Amino acid sequence: MKKIRLFCFFAVALLFLTACTPKPNMETLLSYQAPGTEMTIRITDTETFYAKIKISENEASIIFTDEKREGIAYRMDRDGQICMFFEDVEIPLASSDELKCKDWFALFSIPSGDNIWKIKSETIGGINVYVCRDEKITLYIDAASGLPLKIETEGIVIDVLEAHKKSADG
């Protein structure tokens, strides 16, 4: 009888250990910020805007797609310099500290090691997601694809409506 109990205990313990998969770290979860990622987003920040964000090797671009702002785009390079575009006109912005788009760009270039993150695995609306929280930011990342679903911080909500991450081979 003792052998059966011991066997059952080890079987349950083994089952429990194999069922628990480790959570990925923030570096892995933030890999959607790599070059080649394109997203259709809805930004809610005092107003609601629709845009596409494209992340390349040296810069990120936000191209507005809503009727009111269609054709206007902002591009920020890796040094933090922002240019505004409309059709073929490029306007470098000397002081971009007060621009709201700088806050939006920051949400797509979050450093993984600077913050203490709490990572929780949840099921929301039938989708397995990682909910990642630090002092200011909450990220909802699709567990299957590794792409963000929603980003929230200090009055800004970015809903990712569609996302694509290009593979290394194109």
Outline where the language-model segments fall.
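Small/flexible residues
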Residues: 5-7, 44, 77
